[in-house]
Amino acid sequence: MVLTRLLRVARFMSKVLYTRHDNEVVKITLNNPSRNNAFDDEIISSLITILEDIEHSDNIKLVMLNSNGKHFSAGADLNWMKRMSNCSHEENLKDASMLTTMLQKLNNLKYPTLAVIKGAAFGGGVGLISCCDIALASENSIFSLSEVKVGLIPATISPYVINAVGARNARRLFTSGERFDSNIAKQINLVHEIAKEEDLEKRISYFINHFKQNGPQAVIAAKKIVLDIFNKEIDNSVISHTCEVISALRTSKEGREGVTAFLEKRNPNW
């Protein structure tokens, strides 16, 4: 797409890098290492634009979110927060709405997402991780929801963090502001895997290879059904929806090819 090519140029050497590898894997890289990848309104706006472009792009198997520098993200830039504290309530509502838009677009992105964490992930950085489908962290990573330390709370990221770690863990982490390591992050389901930093690339390749083998439309449908029915009562409407989804996939070109390829003991053509 033209917009994709323009974004690659426009965002190169900016605070967010946007690249496509092997024509199937997209990489979004936080690139503000001098500020420990803390994000402000400029980064949030860039992420919204990038996520919108990805949503409307074709033939993507995996979207990876990572960072340059020592740390994944220090969360919201406090200079930005200080500037916003001098703005009106209406201006702060508009600003917060932009952040919630970005988080929602990341969480609801139709393609699978992989967060790769090195170093510190604080505040909003934890929110970004919580919005991704898979989280892979280096063993030396540290995490914190430290907003209460500066008289704030993790409000906009709260739905996604609570969804990831559960209400009881969130109550502790939101109110204490304590730091915790990658082992605790895995125990509470904030991250799925821990690896030595030198082994991260091997694990990334593992996930890329797996997603490349899967039916692309099936992957999109699999993610969507989780978002569609999570926390809903298992009533007739949910049951009917699941029947409709599997019926459509069984009779789709991709579904027929996948089953046929399996029975013929060959790789599917997709």
Name each model feature, range by range.
Residues M1-N68, Q104:
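Conserved CoA-thioester-binding segment of acyl-CoA-metabolizing enzymes
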Residues F12-N31, R179-F211, I220-F230, G258, ...:
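Amphipathic alpha-helical segments at domain termini/boundaries
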Residues I28, N32, L47, L65, ...:
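Terminal peptide-recognition signature
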Residues E42-S46, M98, K105, R203, ...:
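Charged catalytic carboxylate motif
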Residues I48, N59, S67-M102, A121, ...:
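Glycine- (often His-adjacent) and acidic-residue-rich active-site loop
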Residues S57, L109, K265:
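Acidic-histidine catalytic/liganding microenvironments
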Residues Q104-P216:
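Crotonase-fold acyl-CoA enzyme core
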Residues L173-F174, I225, I229-F230, E244-R250:
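Helix-loop "lid/cap" segments that line or gate small-molecule binding pockets
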